Amino acid sequence: MKNRSRSQWISFLLSPILLAATSAHGQESDAEALAKAAQNPIASMISLPFQNNTNTNFGPQEKTQNVLNIQPVWPFSAGDNWNFITRTIVPVMSQPALTPNGSRTEGLGDITFSGFLSPKVAGQWIWGVGGIGLLPTGDKALTADKWGLGPAVVALTFNGPWVVGGLINNVWSVSGSGPNDVNLMTLQPFLNYNLPGARYFTFAPLITANWEAESGEQWTVPLGVGYGKIFKLGKLPVNGQVSLYHNVVKPTFGPDWQLRVQLQFMFPK
């Protein structure tokens, strides 16, 4: 009887500790699941990323360019078997002068809108197909002044702690009064490694090819690495990320380095 009473008291005293440990493990598992969802461009989750890109030695004057991309992601159900995921990029720009006597230009750039049709039940690979649209919303000197359309594809897979995939699109101008046609490819491969505690390393360079540019001036190819972590503001989960990239291939007046800082506010179901 004494032994049983003693064991009951020990269980009673330890129960708050065990409950707290179980709760902490559950919260950590939820955070790690959110970390992987944040790394899926077509996750069925509303999110609002603010991505700030600081580009050094940009333009003929070799000054700093800054682009804040506001990138809301909004998924919709498209029947029993499909989701339709929208991704909008609204750039707020601060661009240095491109001529010796010019001045810095600040304002809104051209908005891009992408939509992907993706299966609700994924196999080993998660994928989406759709299109991209270019809207001439930019302020003067920050716009191509062209409407554009093109295809867009994304695919990724999870393998243990690894996330591997990529996103590609190409937009062509279809109308508008701008003097130059638009024919621009954007490719973003990504390779992420997830760590305990909802932390991860990321490699997600934004590779572009301006097919309208002269030979030798078309490609921008960055290489670098970043670090991210899921944390909470109150009850709201946030994906914080910092990355640094060096453009190993670039046009003559393209930037040398890019510092990317992102806060992604997530609204899971």
Locate predicted features.
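Transmembrane beta-barrel domains of Gram-negative outer membranes and organellar outer membranes
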Residues: 26-269
